[in-house]
Amino acid sequence: MAAGTAAALAFLSQESRTRAGGVGGLRVPAPVTMDSFFFGCELSGHTRSFTFKVEEEDDAEHVLALTMLCLTEGAKDECNVVEVVARNHDHQEIAVPVANLKLSCQPMLSLDDFQLQPPVTFRLKSGSGPVRITGRHQIVTMSNDVSEEESEEEEEEEDSDEEEAELCPILPAKKQGGRP
């Protein structure tokens, strides 16, 4: 590979990393981790409400994404109204009915990842159930700590970038005498 080509490739490599935010003293955003866990609860004549809470001390962002509500074995052919109690944009508690299930006409309802911020309370407002509520508990964590291993890798990367940048300059070709 010619020295000029190597210099051009080193420049392009350096330029693309700079635009991506990873070189030249630019701050790289904190790594984000996302975990997802199954969620489920059952409301019935014996258990008429369930509250989903998370620890307040936790710095992570929690989301409860509801996927489905369905009547389970032993349900009577009656209206089962499920209500969700949560907080609105003004942090005021509100109660909203989200499903009216009946065994003979609508035994289940898909909620298509209906997202709620905890704490959330589910109440069986009418009917005797049992009503099964399913979904996913999603936890998004932003890591502020950069491990020593990552710091060392970044330093090694910067050192190799500096070495690539210190390529020899392109010199003009020597004239060869005697050729017409």
From Swiss-Prot:
Task: Look up the record and give one Gene Ontology term from the biological process aspect.
Answer: chromatin remodeling
Recorded superkingdom: Eukaryota
Q: Any idea which residues bear Phosphoserine here?
A: S13, S16, S147, S151, S160
Record flagged with keyword Iron-sulfur: no
- Modified sites of kind N-acetylalanine: A2
Quote the PTM field: Phosphorylated.
List the biased-composition ranges (Acidic residues): 146-166
Disulfide pattern: none
What does it do?
A: Plays a role in the regulation of diverse cellular processes such as ribosome biogenesis, chromatin remodeling or protein chaperoning. Modulates the histone chaperone function and the RNA-binding activity of nucleolar phosphoprotein B23/NPM. Efficiently mediates chromatin remodeling when included in a pentamer containing NPM3 and NPM.
**Quaternary structure note:** Interacts with NPM (via N-terminus). Forms a pentamer with NPM at a ratio 4:1 (NPM3/NPM). Two pentamers form a decamer.
Family to which this protein belongs:
Belongs to the nucleoplasmin family.
Q: What is this protein called?
A: Nucleoplasmin-3
In its UniProt entry, the species of origin is given as Pongo abelii (Sumatran orangutan)
Tell me the classification of the organism that encodes this protein. Eukaryota, Metazoa, Chordata, Craniata, Vertebrata
